[in-house]
C-alpha cells in the first residue's frame, strides 16, 4: 500500500456496537410496530446500506412481501417506505443508547494511525440525527475522528463512493489510492472499490459473524466482491498495515 494517508472506517460493527446490534433491534421493532414480524436474519441482510434503502430491501424479502400482503391486503409502495422511514428514527436512537460501546482495539488502532500521520474518518448509513448521537457516544468514550460523513450528506449512499469522496474533501487528502476503507459489510467493500480505494473487511465484530462456523462463508463473501484483506477486527489493523510494504 503506497503512501497511506487516510483510513475511512464504518461505524457500527467496525468501531462501535459489537455485532451491529443497534440497527437490527431498531428494524425488528420498526416492523413489529407496523404489524410485521421479521427475523434477525431478515433485518441483517441489507446491512451497510442507507437506512431508507435498508427498509426497501427488507420489504422486497419474499417472506416480508407475503406477510405485508396478508396484513394490508396490498404490496408495499413508496408511501409505505416513507412512512416506515419517518418512524424509524426513534427506534434507532433508543437502540444506539443501548449499543454504543467501542469495539476493543478501536481506540488503540486510531491512535496508532495518528502517530504515523495517517488521518482517520468515518462513513455511516445512519441519517444525521442518528449519526450525531453515534459520534457523541464515541466521543464520550474518547474516540473522535478527523472527519465524518453520513447518508444525508450525499446524493447517494453506499454502494456509491460519495461518502468516501466527502471525507476526502473534508480532510483534503487524495488520491483514492492513498485511502483505505475498513468495514464489516458487503456495501462497505463496494463503497471502497467504487471510490478506487483499498478495502479491508472485518469478520468477528460485524453483523454477519455467527461464530467460527461462519468464518469460511463470510470470508468467501467478502473475497467474491473484491475486498483486499479480511481481518478479525479493527484491533488487527496496525499489525496488518505494518506488514504491508510501503504503507
What are the residue ranges of the model-derived segments?
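N-terminal helical cap/lid subdomain that shapes the substrate entry/recognition surface
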Residues: 2-107, 111-116, 132
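Glycine- and other small-residue-rich loops at beta-strand/loop junctions that grip anionic moieties
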Residues: 99, 123, 156
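Structural motif
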Residues: 46, 123-125, 182
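Asp-based, Mg2+/Mn2+-dependent phosphohydrolase catalytic module
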Residues: 1-4, 107-115, 127-247
Amino acid at each position: 500500500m503506497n503512501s497511506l494517508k487516510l483510513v475511512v472506517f464504518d461505524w457500527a460493527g467496525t468501531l462501535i456496537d459489537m455485532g451491529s446490534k443497534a440497527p437490527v433491534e431498531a428494524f425488528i421493532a420498526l416492523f413489529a410496530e407496523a404489524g410485521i414480524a421479521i427475523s434477525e436474519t431478515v433485518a441483517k441482510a441489507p446491512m451497510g446500506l442507507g437506512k431508507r434503502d435498508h427498509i426497501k430491501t427488507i420489504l422486497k424479502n419474499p417472506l416480508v412481501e407475503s406477510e405485508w400482503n396478508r396484513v394490508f391486503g396490498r404490496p408495499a409502495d413508496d408511501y409505505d417506505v416513507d412512512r416506515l422511514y419517518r418512524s424509524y428514527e426513534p427506534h434507532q436512537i433508543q437502540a444506539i443508547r443501548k449499543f454504543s460501546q467501542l469495539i476493543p482495539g478501536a481506540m488503540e488502532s486510531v491512535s496508532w494511525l495518528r502517530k504515523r500521520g495517517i488521518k482517520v474518518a468515518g462513513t455511516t448509513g445512519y441519517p444525521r440525527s442518528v449519526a450525531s448521537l453515534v459520534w457523541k457516544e464515541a466521543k464520550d468514550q474518547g474516540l473522535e475522528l478527523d472527519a465524518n460523513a453520513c447518508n444525508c450528506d450525499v446524493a447517494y449512499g453506499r454502494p456509491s463512493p460519495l461518502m468516501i469522496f466527502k471525507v476526502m474533501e473534508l480532510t483534503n487528502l487524495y488520491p483514492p489510492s492513498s485511502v483505505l476503507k475498513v468495514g464489516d459489510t458487503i456495501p462497505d467493500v463496494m463503497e471502497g472499490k467504487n471510490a478506487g480505494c483499498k478495502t479491508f473487511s472485518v469478520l468477528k465484530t460485524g453483523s454477519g459473524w455467527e461464530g467460527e462456523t461462519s468464518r469460511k462463508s463470510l470470508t468467501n463473501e467478502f473475497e467474491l466482491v473484491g475486498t483486499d484483506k479480511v481481518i478479525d477486527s479493527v484491533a488487527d489493523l496496525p499489525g496488518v498495515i505494518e506488514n504491508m510494504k510501503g504503507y
